[in-house]
């Protein structure tokens, strides 16, 4: 068995090095990886209605049909194939989409074997990361800046553009023809990439493919943004669209660097712009600078033209607003953040003269947004839209221990997530709602009133953990740049990675 696994990983590694992916689509072990490894759960078991053995038989039949000529496209109207699709009408596209997702990730993956010493070190540092590392970053960096722009990364992007971009990463023409055919025939592309309120609203069958395509698109756009950041002093806005037309784009970049190195490195004098800070989180980004708003407008135009000419995505200029930090505020990862000016007067005396000196200091405030949180709690049936706690009837059939444990788990998760807030009054209100919801659920189960239930059981000892402060929270750990991203961090491009995010945080 170990020899077979070694052979599988060897074939995958060879395909990655040679950028030849087409044969992997017809390998059964690719779909075995989907089934047997930790890829956000198995698509076979999540769709129910059949056991694992029968689903693996479907995979073998699927591979056989793919090997046969003129059997790639399966029509739902074909009566001979209805029996094959009788388990689940979406099963075929689910299996293939998961297999495609694994194959296209191969040329972009840094290593395949997760048991190496380096990956253990990386995994260890990932466990040290916390959402609380964001706030020292903002206090140390953004509070000293004057202008900030907070906007959403525009999408959807056209399928054909993504396929063309991916061709620069792997030189396998048959695979990309098959990839294009598959996306057009089997995936409902409009549902796959149409913008929603949150990524979590996408169906589970398409989530892995969507996340790969979206992250690949963001990676491509940020790599170009970094090039712009380093060479912006040599680019004029009028020539920007010519440079970023898609035809021979990478050749233009190489030619630009070549010309600059030969002709301009010693003779051209220019004004070097100060740093632009760039932060990406979820589906949004932040641009911040200490300089005048003119520089921020320049970068705003650069990004709009980059999306327009390179990705054929239109972004409304009026949706990207540039605000002063002292006047603007923004939502970040479930928090409401703004910079407040603290003014203080200091008396200074020199000999017989005294002076009053006004000192202005910036302070970052991170507030728990109570209204969106109550809306999320109401949607989860813990309270009504006004924030009044209600019972959770679907949990009333569980034991008392499991009911209390479920509520406490949610409460602890929210406490871990929102303990970085500078004002915790809203957090205490959320915990109060969960506490009363738990009491009402227990009273409903025992067919009693809340008052009688508390008097009989005693509320202080039973539910004291709801208001117990966390003694130790893993926080204030900001991940340093890895060897592959040192250039990004030196260029003021920040990646704030979050290991855990509670579902209730996605308010939008």
From Swiss-Prot:
Its main location: plastid. It is found in: Plastid, Chloroplast. It comes from the Eukaryota. Coiled coil: none annotated. The keyword Chloroplast applies. GO terms for molecular function: RNA binding. GO terms for cellular component: chloroplast. Keywords: Chloroplast, mRNA processing, Plastid, RNA-binding, tRNA processing. GO terms for biological process: mRNA processing; RNA splicing; tRNA processing. Pfam families: Intron_maturas2, MatK_N. Belongs to the intron maturase 2 family. MatK subfamily. Usually encoded in the trnK tRNA gene intron. Probably assists in splicing its own and other chloroplast group II introns. This is Maturase K. It comes from Lupinus cosentinii. The lineage of its organism: Eukaryota, Viridiplantae, Streptophyta, Embryophyta, Tracheophyta. The gene is matK.
